[in-house]
Amino acid sequence: MNSTGRIPLWLVVTFGGIVVLTVLGIFIYGSYSGLGSSL
């Protein structure tokens, strides 16, 4: 595999994981805070 000039796969997976966990965390926090009930 030639990965020159491209973003490393591990970096994409790590960044994607952080984004997903952050979004899920905000959604769960909003649900417990009562903000999720208004959606």
Curated annotation (Swiss-Prot):
Record-stated family: Belongs to the PsbJ family.
Coiled coil location: none
InterPro entries recorded: PSII_PsbJ (IPR002682), PSII_PsbJ_sf (IPR037267)
Topological category with respect to the lipid bilayer: Single-pass membrane protein
GO cellular component, one term: chloroplast thylakoid membrane
Function, as annotated: One of the components of the core complex of photosystem II (PSII). PSII is a light-driven water:plastoquinone oxidoreductase that uses light energy to abstract electrons from H(2)O, generating O(2) and a proton gradient subsequently used for ATP formation. It consists of a core antenna complex that captures photons, and an electron transfer chain that converts photonic excitation into a charge separation.
GO BP annotation list: photosynthesis
PANTHER family, per the entry: PHOTOSYSTEM II REACTION CENTER PROTEIN J
Keyword Plastid: yes
Keywords: Chloroplast, Membrane, Photosynthesis, Photosystem II, Plastid, Reaction center, Thylakoid, Transmembrane, Transmembrane helix
Classification of source organism: Eukaryota, Rhodophyta, Bangiophyceae, Cyanidiales, Cyanidiaceae
Annotated transmembrane regions: 9-29
Quaternary context: PSII is composed of 1 copy each of membrane proteins PsbA, PsbB, PsbC, PsbD, PsbE, PsbF, PsbH, PsbI, PsbJ, PsbK, PsbL, PsbM, PsbT, PsbY, PsbZ, Psb30/Ycf12, at least 3 peripheral proteins of the oxygen-evolving complex and a large number of cofactors. It forms dimeric complexes.
Protein name per Swiss-Prot or TrEMBL: Photosystem II reaction center protein J
Compartment(s): Plastid, Chloroplast thylakoid membrane
Gene3D superfamilies: 6.10.250.2070
